[in-house]
Regions:
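Active-site mouth loops of central-metabolism enzymes
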Residues: 83-92, 132-140
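A glycine-rich phosphate/pyrophosphate-binding beta-strand-loop-alpha-helix module
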Residues: 94-132
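Alpha/beta enzyme core
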Residues: 86, 100, 121, 125, ...
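A structural motif shared across PLP-dependent enzymes of the aminotransferase-like
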Residues: 36-39, 89-94
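An N-cap/entry alpha-helix motif that binds or orients negatively charged groups
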Residues: 1-72, 170, 177-182
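Conserved, mostly hydrophobic/aromatic
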Residues: 24, 81, 102, 160
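Hydrophobic faces of well-ordered beta-strands that scaffold small-molecule active sites
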Residues: 79-82, 109-111, 130-134, 158
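Metal-dependent C-N hydrolase catalytic cores
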Residues: 67, 74-87
């Protein structure tokens, strides 16, 4: 077995099953669900399973590196922790835990506009290396405040969410009684 794989966490389906047992139902539905009939969620899952990595045999493997440069900064891997709203609902201190792990492993961490940790706290944990995802609020003054706080905290990368003009219909959340304020 590879020494890079933690046998306690062998794969994503295993982690999902563990999370379903451990996280309250309404929070798991939020984390695991998608909008409308979950068509895009299903499509994304199917398409990622169709990705095939091409192996290169009989080559020197001593200097293998996944390092990459994104926006002028070198990271240990070409992926990071994407923004998840209401992380603290899923697990206490989740935003802080994930930000710390991302910082220690030198991968990007993106704080959601509706994250449960403050911009300032995440900037402190990541020494300003976090990214901030802006989900444009209805009120311009709120947007301006978020952007000001982000800049003052030393966060230099902004991810602007421009996929939908409003929150999607999430039937799992409706069934579980979860309601998110506007």
């Amino acid at each position: 077995m590879s020494d890079h794989i933690n046998p306690k966490y062998p794969d994503i389906p295993y982690l999902r099953a563990k999370a379903k047992k451990r996280i309250p139902g309404f929070a798991f539905d939020y984390l695991d669900g998608g909008c409308n009939a979950e068509i895009n969620l299903d499509r994304n899952t199917r398409e990622i399973r169709e990705v095939q990595l091409k192996p290169y045999y009989l080559r020197d493997y001593q200097d293998i590196s996944m390092e990459t440069v994104l926006f002028g900064k070198k990271y240990s891997a070409p992926f990071g922790i994407s923004p998840i709203g209401l992380q603290g609902m899923i697990w206490p201190g989740a935003s802080e835990i994930l930000a710390k792990a991302a910082f220690e492993e030198n991968i990007p961490f993106i704080l959601s506009t509706v994250g449960t940790a403050s911009i300032e706290k995440i900037a402190e944990i990541t020494e300003g290396s976090a990214w901030f995802q802006l989900y444009h609020p209805v009120e311009d003054s709120l947007r301006d405040d978020l952007l000001k706080r982000t800049a003052e905290a030393g966060i230099e990368l902004l991810v602007i969410l421009a996929d939908v003009p409003s929150f999607g219909y999430r039937s799992k959340e409706i069934r579980s009684g979860l309601a998110i304020p506007p």
